A protein has these predicted regions:
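Active-site metal-binding loops of divalent metal-dependent hydrolases
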Residues: 15, 50, 221-223
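Conserved acidic, metal-coordinating active-site core of Asp-based
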Residues: 108-220, 224-225, 229
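Hydrophobic packing residues within well-ordered alpha-helices of enzyme cores
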Residues: 55-59, 167, 246, 262
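Short, structured coil segments at secondary-structure junctions
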Residues: 62-64, 72, 80, 174-178, ...
Length: 270
């Protein structure tokens, strides 16, 4: 029997809630399947809202042989060469004004500014989202003035959903909605990235690179921030326990996240 080959496939997967169950590490079954996939000619890239640094521990032992997408589409980075290939940035003083208003009007929120190298938390440690301590984030607790002159890639607010609805109104009031893309990555996570930025948009950049020309894109994701990625793919896949928005954007529904998704893909899709 001939060994199955994947020389024409580019597999792009979200991490949290797709490849990795919440608050856990990647399963051995997924690791083995991914490495078998790349050994047989497949190309694999991660697509995550995480920083490269916080994603790396979850990718330990996996062959990531294509540039990966970070900050929900604001960065494309080749991890093997530690080289940033593309970034999208939040430009203008309006972002500093918006951040100051959010800090003043939502004192219980966890407010984070992401630069290429760091996650800067602008709020007291008492407000920290639990994921910061448990998911390999290198956190810099600081203040807005300290990061005003940095180059921002992503602005993130963790708060109760009702409060985030008022943050959205504030964004409209200040015109932030006209100079950004915003989305929920969880019910209590509201994120702002540069205009026309998404995992899907950066995946188009990756797909167009000469090294991957002609490969079919198989993409996996579980939440609204994955929807464009799922739609741009030749085959978009969402776990059974994904959000309704993600499932509506997908072509195929995989078993729930706790069941390893990559063996299922290799068995059911190819």
């Amino acid at each position: 029997m001939c060994e199955k080959r994947y020389d024409d496939i580019l597999l792009i997967s979200d991490l949290d809630g797709t490849l990795i169950p919440r608050y856990e590490m990647i399963s051995e079954e997924n690791i083995r399947a991914l490495n078998a996939f790349t050994a047989a000619g497949g190309v694999f890239a991660a697509a995550t809202g995480r920083t490269p640094e916080s994603a790396l521990p979850y990718l330990d032992g996996i062959t990531v042989n294509a540039p990966s997408i970070f900050f929900n589409g604001a960065m494309l980075k080749d991890l093997s060469k530690n080289q940033v290939l593309e970034t999208r940035t939040l430009d203008g003083d309006i972002w500093r004004t918006f951040a100051a208003r959010v800090l003043y009007q939502f004192p219980r929120a966890c407010v984070e500014v992401y630069t290429a190298e760091h996650c800067h938390v602008l709020t007291p440690e008492a407000n920290d989202d639990p994921r910061l301590a448990g998911e390999f984030y290198n956190v810099d607790h600081t203040n807005l003035k300290t990061v005003e002159d940095e180059t921002w890639l992503k602005f993130f607010i963790c708060d109760a959903p009702i409060n985030l609805s008022f943050v959205e109104r504030l964004a409209e009031e200040l015109g932030i909605d006209k100079c950004s893309t915003s989305f929920y990555s969880e019910a209590n996570y509201l994120e702002f990235v540069p205009p026309h930025t998404s995992k899907g948009a950066m995946a188009e950049v990756l797909k167009a690179m000469p090294a991957y020309a002609g490969r079919r894109v198989i993409a996996c994701g579980d939440y609204g921030n994955d929807a464009e990625l799922l739609r741009m793919a030749d085959i978009g896949i969402a776990p059974e326990d994904a959000s309704e928005e993600a499932k509506a954007a997908a072509d195929r529904i995989a078993p729930p996240c706790r069941e390893p998704i990559v063996p299922w893909i290799l068995r059911e899709i190819f």
